[in-house]
Amino acid sequence: MPIAREQPPLDLDLAFFHWLAGPHVTGAAGDEALVLDELARLVRDPQTASTLVPRVPAVIPQVLRSLRSDAASSADLARQVAQDAVLVAEVLREVNSPYYQPGTPVRNLEGALLLLGQNGLRMLLARVAFRRIISLQTSRLARLVSPQLWNQSEKCAQAASLLAPRHGADPFEAYLAGLMHNVGLVVALRVIDGLLPAGGLPDSDAFGLRLVHAARLVSAGIAGQWELPPAIGHAIAHLGDAATVSTSLPAALGQADCLAKLHMLAGGGQPAFVAAVAALPVGLRQVYDTFNETDNADRQDA
């Protein structure tokens, strides 16, 4: 997605692809058509695509449904989350980290709810669940780039939830869309690992753009398989479409995706990206600056 600046515009999708892929292009490029044809097949067959990544825990769609119920209580939310013991353990470990700074150790979900509130617990729950999906990869290439992909996903989700109210979108749906939008890219990396020799990742501009587009459609299809709200899949499928830049959730997700990619690219100090950060409008710069606060908290946690 281009970002407005002096000519020529920056294409952050393409720049991020090259930044992600560059260290892993070590040999002759493999067959681009082979990869793109397989991704096109997975776009048409989201059920098969969804088997290439761990499934989102069943509690996530349940939590989403409870959001639409006026009768849903904190106790209902705690009961839903308690169905997944592994998820509960990860949530409690996370909520006791320096990032959240609890005054006393939190030992159960009720304590986490008191500290975070319902919306805060929902977001933490989603973050823990999707981190497992993106980070626990066995294929070589997906495993190597998963830390960067998770970093971008987490930042995109954070920004999308902050931008959602400005666009009339639901903050939690925006947060989930940010976490979900790179899942198709994980699938694409697994496809590349299965079809091409090590080091054979193609890195042409044309391939990068087509891969990113196909991966988004795969993400959207998997979101449907996982029973996430249709608005999430729609927003992901239309990321970067000019016709949706001013419409609710797609607009919030599009801006968030750009900000998250820009933050990671600007971290390398390249003048073009640093200048793009300096040119951000005030409202977007405020959201961008929250990434630094989160990174600082994560370093303290480490």
Where are the predicted features?
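Catalytic or ion-translocation cores adjacent to nucleophile or general acid/base/metal-coordination motifs
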Residues: 198
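Conserved alpha-helical "signature site"
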Residues: 1-194, 202-302
